[in-house]
């Protein structure tokens, strides 16, 4: 049975290969692209990280010097260096311009950091930090002026499986990107308000709003996918949130709730490209 270190190693390498798949594939030539293909992809990743290949039969056709030579040539081509499809490079160049697009795609190719939001209905930041320290999880407060003093996210220093922790199971915190934690405060919510989250997804922002509202009032969370709303309901139960109800976002449901809320949150679906840091496989599916 694999231990935590083994799982992190395997998962990290798989994500790396998925993220840089096109770049790695472009370094292969001839028979390398058809014979023991996945071994060849692994070999490229191994070589470009500076390791020596083991003397395995599957690597017999791989020449490290050739791989490095082709790599140096290919990284002069942005779509290969960034390991993105042609269509994505064309759209990015058109919308951002060359200089900004290169910054953007470089950022999207970085591994995403992990942030958590303290559930103020159950805990304080200091308590969560103390509990996590006892569970061997190191954190630091995000000291950014964009966040209120009481609303600062915690950054997880070393990526680990947080869902197995007692503090997570007890609903003391939620995993949520730092940028996402900026949204709910902008609504200037007050306890007792009626709020509609019309593109709720799995409910990260709805749960945050419930905390700001001190679990008083009502939040109607809507989405087109029932499975996401089911996950929201599970998260709400764990967090001790009682004011969220869910509904499939149909035309009838929208008309029924027309002009009935104090606040409306629309985190509308967009290109979906912002997920590439966490889900690099998305660029091969769009």
Q: What is each model feature region?
A:
Residues 1-286:
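S-adenosylmethionine
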